[in-house]
């Protein structure tokens, strides 16, 4: 029921509080004013991935960003039970570590403006997540302590926030249809919720949880390379 309250508040903010054109960066010449133009806008969100390959790459990076989040929630409770971490402790870890993610979403936005969006995504997002996703998984092996596992999980959540500048970087890659570029990122965010559990389902028997985690670490390194390729050197 609380989620319904949050969704309602978000709808009010989007539809009434923030409806003024001069406060919306994506409203202007591209604003749809009829049913036909709205349909064209929808098609442009799909066509831009073909017309602007860098936007497609940015969308793939967005998928990789939170893939581990949706994979971990599937198998980490089962994995940690082997080390004596029960469901209650796991729920406490999972709920607590994302408080750090919320805080660092803001911090990495500021960091990105100072050192560059691309650099922030590459080093904190890509490389940082590759290291921290492994550290979180191997935490009970290194030191089977609740607080140590929580700290490693918090570091992973902090590094997830390193992808925050992607929301600014991808629209900046196109001269027009910036709204369509943002929609590609939204699509990537949604796909991550599907891709994460899919990876676990496909590879659990073949390579086990260890193989899955190393595979995800490889995906993060790949996302760092992809971001480096699409990001302008001054961003």
Tell me the role of every PLM-derived stretch:
Residues 118-166:
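C-terminal transmembrane helical hairpin of 12-TM major facilitator-type secondary transporters
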Residues 86-94, 145, 178, 182:
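Juxtamembrane helix-start elements in MFS-like secondary transporters
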Residues 53-105:
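Extracytoplasmic gate region of multi-pass secondary transporters
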Residues 21-59:
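Juxtamembrane intracellular "pre-TM" segments in multi-pass secondary transporters
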Residues 105-117, 204:
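Helix-to-loop junctions at the C-terminal end of transmembrane segments
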Residues 174-209, 216:
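A late C-terminal transmembrane helix in Major Facilitator Superfamily
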